[in-house]
Amino acid sequence: MRFRLTFAALPLLSGLFLGHPAVAAEKPLEGITLVLDPGHAVKNDAGKIINAGAYGRGGTQERDIALKVAETIAPLLEAQGAKVIMTRTRDNPWRYGYSASADNRGRAILANLVRADAYIRIHCDWNRDKRFKGHTTFFYRWGSRPLAEAVHDALVRALPGHRDNGIKRRSFVSVSAQMPAILVELGVLSNRVEGKELAQESHESHLAMAVAEGVVEYFKKSKT
């Protein structure tokens, strides 16, 4: 996916990924390995979908949005020196397993095997209450809380006027991951307004910039 510069993303770009050449040359993520996990999109060996993810009005699929956002985040982090590994890609958009829970464990195990410094899961939310909206960041192990705070704070700054559902501790983030791990719900597909936003490439790029900014800020602080 080709990243498109939008006016909404300019403040983040100028404050982090551009700026003075000497600052950009520092590459704060040098030596850092990150696993990005765009959620869902699992089939069994027979080719049947067993984890489709949420959907919005007009057929918008969570799995597609998560993948596009993650593939926009990846080069931003690589530009800062990180090695980025994706659990699925545009060329290989589907994963295969016998259950959704087993596949989720497999994604975390991948992060363990590559000795990732952070495991970042990208999702969109869904709720029976169509009025429910906003972004939420989840963590499980307490050592993951600083990463959750950094990414969530960046999203709050990037999304003025959007509902902030806060940072929450939930075991579904990953009990298997042995490094800081978070799950980011970028917005709510079942909400009419946010569902439309999440389907817009400009908004997806804006979200990607915010997540990337939060990750960079986390590692900058962890090195001090």
Predicted regions and their residues:
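Solvent-exposed loop/turn segments at secondary-structure junctions
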Residues: 40-43, 90-94, 124-130, 142-145, ...
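Mature extracellular/periplasmic domains of secretome proteins
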Residues: 101-117, 140-141, 172-178
